[in-house]
Amino acid sequence: MLTAVTGINWGDEGKGRVIDLLAENADVVARYQGGDNAGHTVVTEQGKFILNLLPSGILHPEVTCVLGAGMVIDLDHLSREIDAIEERGVKVDPENLKLSDKATISMPWHKVQDGLEEDRLAQKGRAFGSTRRGIAYAYSDKYRKKTLRLGDLLHLDEERVQNRLHVILESKNLELAGCYHQEPMSYDALLEWCRMQAGQFAPYICDVGAFLKQAHDSGKRIVLEAQLGAMRDIDYGIFPFTSSSNTLAAYAPLGAGIPNCRLDHVVGVLKAYSTCVGAGPFAAENAMSEDWNEQLRKAGGEYGAATGRPRRVGPFDCVASRYGLTCQGADKIALTKLDVLSSMKEIPVITGYTLDGVQVPSFDPLSDLDRVKPVVTMLPGWNKDISGCKSWDELPKEAKAYVEFLEKQLGHEIQFVSTGAEREKFVLKGEWL
């Protein structure tokens, strides 16, 4: 069975939480796009883990994890991440982690270039809100054919690879010197860096497409793990305030390495309220007062897992979520962090937008989203700790009414509701996987 777990909104919906649960019965968990520019948080009996590159399934020793062809991989960051979780007793070796030979390497200059450009824009008051992880530059060079793939590390002594390195470095030094007045990098230093990475990661690099296809054909349970959410998709998100990859479920088999396989299920993950990291239109943050937003931010611990930046927050946005559901084509929905709302007497929900006093019929990522005004409906809250609830019937009637209101607005049943960060704190409503 092939299942994709995707974000419906701007990311940070709690996908890692859901994937960790599904990994209990999975054979393989594979990342299919993005890099280390976002983090999945998983809480286990060993404590809290923040994973930027490693799939959330790495915390299950019987699961094989894959970094797929659609990713851009900062190998220095991956090395540090592996060291960090191994120090906490998590096994990582070529048996349970496989890296696609077709994945793009995030080269040393990509983060440098990202930071320099963000600083240049900031001086003009036009900062983009980049994570400075070099993601856009790695993807840009991928499509310009001006970078290496992981498989090239296995052939560094071949003339064709060394010639490509010369061509790539010549082009990059021209860019960095001409645009940012940086000193050129040497070929010898670059080749040495590549050899160092090959020395560590060569045993992990393989044709993951063949591995995944064999697993799929033999009936293994495969979970494909997305990064970020629909609003950050390069094609269907709020352009240009997007990531540089395709975050949608339709891309999952392709980015993982099995373009000839069809998804059986798509799990769309929603948070019980709205959050966003980075620049761009985000109507939800204008629905309530900044004091209300700050209280929600503190209650939910809403700070970026990869960057530590305070997340922009607001009420649940039904308009944006309907669009995200359409993009992802989800047949299962997981709602996370319902417990964060437990202290509120009333809970706001965004049920519409207006623009210049006229109701906006639907969410359009290319329209004047920075000018829309949210229409808010207030629902009764519940003054009860729900973290101990183990079934739908145990939830307060107001909490159940809140979830059912969202279902009606979205036109889709919600099957999974998390009531706390820990693995066991969730309730099921309807048929789950």
Language-model-detected regions and their locations in the chain:
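Non-transmembrane, aqueous-exposed alpha-helical and coiled segments at domain scale
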Residues: 1-433
